[in-house]
């Protein structure tokens, strides 16, 4: 005997999986990818501004463009949360992540397989609301997730970019360090 699942249960299950009401974008699809992380309480205009960050490109030889740094710090100050970008080696924004005022939780990195490579080919660029240096959590994420680079842009009181702090993974060394800031 076949059991039918009522549509209401399907809708509830879908709402639990995707609280925003939207399915995640298909891989390789044309839809604008979702913003990950702590997006509850954001206005639709703020979510739209965060989604537009996916359209930005960074020259592969640069860490960040001045325009992108300003866009990141302005939205971060407005929503009073850290905002992070995962950028690949080609300069394409692959994920936009919203955190709390103190930290971001990096999205699932399964699509960036390590394989034989030592690093994932992804750099994390995020904001710090108090214009502070990289935290121990940032350095731990850098080392354990095998990111190419971890950078934090300080947000000044007027929303402009402040100092930029960065760290990268170092090869095996006598001191036993895994990162260098």
Question: Can you describe what each PLM-predicted range is?
Answer:
Residues 5-117:
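Glycine-rich short-loop/terminal segments
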Residues 28, 40-41, 49-50, 150-181:
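Active-site or metal-binding loop neighborhoods of secreted/extracellular toxin and effector enzymes
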Residues 80-84, 120-122, 147-149:
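Short, surface-exposed beta-edge/turn micro-motifs
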Residues 84-86, 93-96, 142, 150-152, ...:
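Generic structural hydrophobic/aromatic packing signal, biased to beta-strands
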Residues 87-91, 129-130, 152-160:
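Short, flexible beta-strand-to-coil junctions
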Residues 96-146, 155-156:
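Short HxH-centered metal-ligating active-site micro-motif
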């Amino acid at each position: 005997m076949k059991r039918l699942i009522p549509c209401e249960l399907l809708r509830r299950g879908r709402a639990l999986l995707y609280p925003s009401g939207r399915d995640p974008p298909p891989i390789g699809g044309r839809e604008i990818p979702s913003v990950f992380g702590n997006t509850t309480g954001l206005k639709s205009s703020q979510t739209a501004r965060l989604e537009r960050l996916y359209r930005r490109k960074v020259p592969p030889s640069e860490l960040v463009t001045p325009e992108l740094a300003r866009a990141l710090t302005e939205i971060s100050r407005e929503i009073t949360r850290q905002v992070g970008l995962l950028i690949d080696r080609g300069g394409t924004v692959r994920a936009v992540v919203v955190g709390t005022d103190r930290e971001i939780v990096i999205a699932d990195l399964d699509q960036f397989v390590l394989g034989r490579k030592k690093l994932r080919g992804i750099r994390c660029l995020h904001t710090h609301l108090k214009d502070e240096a990289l935290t121990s959590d940032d350095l731990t994420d850098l080392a354990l997730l095998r990111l190419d680079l971890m950078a934090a842009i300080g947000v000044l009181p007027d929303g402009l970019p402040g100092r930029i702090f960065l760290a990268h993974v170092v090869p095996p060394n006598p001191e036993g360090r895994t990162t260098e800031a």
